Structures are given as structure tokens and as C-alpha cells.
Amino acid sequence: MEKITSRENAKVKYACRLASSGAFRRAEGRFLAEGRKLCPELCRGAELETLFCTESALEKCPELSELSGEHYLVEDHVADKLADVGTHQGVFGVFRTPVHTLEEVKTGGRYLALERVQDPGNVGTLLRSAAAFGFDGVLLSDGCASVFAPKTLRASMGAAVRVPVMEVGAMPAAIAALRAKNITCLAAALYQSQPLSAARPGYPGGVCVVIGSEGQGLTEETIAACSGTVRIPMTCLLYTSPSPRDQRGS
């Protein structure tokens, strides 16, 4: 296995740029992930092109050598450059980004849609929840945190490739596309909403729950595009994040 000793190595610099720039990730169709558990987990739904690992990491996890792609040993100071956080596990992978579109949405499916959810941790947690509940896909509007940014990947714990993620641009147009397939779209908002428990239990055409940004909630255009609005009643006033709300109901 070839060993990289310089922080200025071209492959290392390329990987670092993937981690730091969303525009570069989109242009290249690739992303960088790190972690002894996360990298193998991502291999379940994304193609691993390049694996970087330190000697100590390989000694602890020899099964890493069985992963696909090109493998490189890196010295600790090189791993420090690749790392997004100060304490790392010495394992990094460059993956091809899975691409999914609205054409894959199917009648009868269950979907989650996020509009302008900006915190990477929140996006990652919602992806993980969608995967855990067996959702068929997640739609992300413009303004959402990048799914394949390092912080989002850590929060999603591999869910970013276990559930199809579709970047849809403007949410009202995406909702129109779903409703054209007989999918009921429910906006999570306070204004003129009904409790989630009172919503009709069966949606034979499928259902999509639409959640808005942490601070502003859903846009009026998105709420108007949906089939209805719902809320989750709370027994006391607690701060939750993300907490979708419509400004008119504040």
C-alpha cells in the first residue's frame, strides 16, 4: 500500500477541498467522509474511490483493507489535515455522490421534505430518523445544509446513503410534482393546523411531511402548495430544534 507523507500531496489536497467546499462537491460529484464506522457504512450505498488511513487505524481495523477503491497509508500529520475535527480516528474516504431525482418518487411512498433547514446536525438527524422509520426518500430545498458536508454526514451516521436524498430546488414546485402522483403533502406549521393525531390515518396515494427551517418555518408559498397543515401537540413549552413553525402562528 502506497504511503503518503506530505500534506501537500495532490490527492490529500483534493480530499480536503471536497470537505470544505459544497460547490466543489457538487461539481465533482464526490464527497469526503471520516470515521472507522462511517466509511464502511457509507460503502453500502455509495462507491468508495479512495481510502486514506493511518497505520494505527489499520491495525485496529484490519477489515478496512477489504474495502473497495484505492488505498493509501497516511502519516499522522497528514491525517490531521484531512480531519474535520481535532480528534479523529485516522480513516477517511472519498466517495461518489449518489444522485436521486423526483422521477424516482412513487405513488404510495412515504417521504420527508425539508425546506431551508440550515443546521447540519438537524439535517443529519432528520435523515437518520427517515431511514429508521423506513421512509422512501427525503427532499431538500435550496438553502438546506449540505447532506454530504462532514458535520451532516456525522449526524446522519450513514443514513445519507441509506435513504434516497433528492435536491429539489424550490419546494412548492416539488410539492406540485408529488401531488401530481396523488401523494398527500402535509405542512408542519402552527397556523390553522390540526393535531397530527387527528390527521386521516390512511393515505393510499402516499404521504409527504414537509418541515421548515429552524427559525422561520415554512414559507407561505410552500404551505399553500401542501394538501393541509399538521402540528405535534406538546404538553409544556419546550425548545426543540428544528422546530418548524409558520410565522403567522407565532
Regions found by a protein language model. Give the residues of each.
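Short beta->alpha connector loops at strand-helix junctions that form conserved
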Residues: 74-75, 115, 141-142, 164, ...
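Conserved small/polar residues in nucleotide/adenosyl-binding loops
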Residues: 239-244
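Glycine/small-residue-rich loop that forms an oxyanion/phosphate-binding "nest" at active or ligand-binding sites
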Residues: 74-86
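Boundary-proximal intrinsically disordered activation/regulatory segments immediately upstream
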Residues: 1-55
